[in-house]
Amino acid sequence: PVTEDTPFGKAENPYGATKQTGEILYDQFFRNRPTKSGISLRYFNPAGAHPSALIGESPTQNATNLVPVITETAIGVREQITVFGDDYPSRDGSCVRDYVHVVDLARAHTLAIEHLLQHKNDNRYEVYNLGIGEGVTVLEAIFAFQEATGVQVNYKIGPRRPGDVAAIYADNTRI
């Protein structure tokens, strides 16, 4: 699991590099401004929707995140899902990710703001992981969807994608 104190390694892709750079800049900003404080919330893989459907994933173009890709395949928008790699060191050979519900993310934002407004943060800059703290493989997510809905999802195994890490999930004990 990744803790908030895990040192940054080399980013595997531009998205990861921007996340690292942002945290470094925030840390420097708040360290040098004693009257300011801030919190970074590290999302792992947001998924799901609020029951009202006011927040959640509803891509207007081709989805790239796993849950909407599964959904698009189930309803026939896509012919099939490509599972990128089946030779990772995981339970079934597919990548492992930590999925966190969007309602939990919204609640975490509310709590972070309350924490800052009540001046409860001991440090001027704090980082919190937002994840469930355990990994789910891509194939497990597909099979769970099928079991929950009774809808078969057509998938195929493809080659690994450059930059994909085998497994990443949160150590969420700090939050």
For the regions a language model picked out, list residue spans one by one.
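Active-site proximal helix/loop that lines the substrate pocket
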Residues: 7, 48-51, 88, 135
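Hydrophobic, Gly/Ser/Ala-rich alpha-helical and linker tracts in large acyl-processing enzymes
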Residues: 50-63, 70-73, 79
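Enrichment for repetitive, rod-forming helical segments
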Residues: 26-27, 49, 116
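Short, charged helix-to-loop "capping" segments that act as catalytic/coupling loops
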Residues: 33, 51-61, 85-97
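Catalytic helix-loop patch of NAD(P)-dependent Rossmann-fold dehydrogenases
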Residues: 1-45, 54-65
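C-terminal substrate-binding subdomain of Rossmann-fold SDR/epimerase-dehydratase oxidoreductases
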Residues: 3, 67-175
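Conserved sequence/active-site signature of Rossmann-fold short-chain dehydrogenase/reductase
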Residues: 46-49, 105
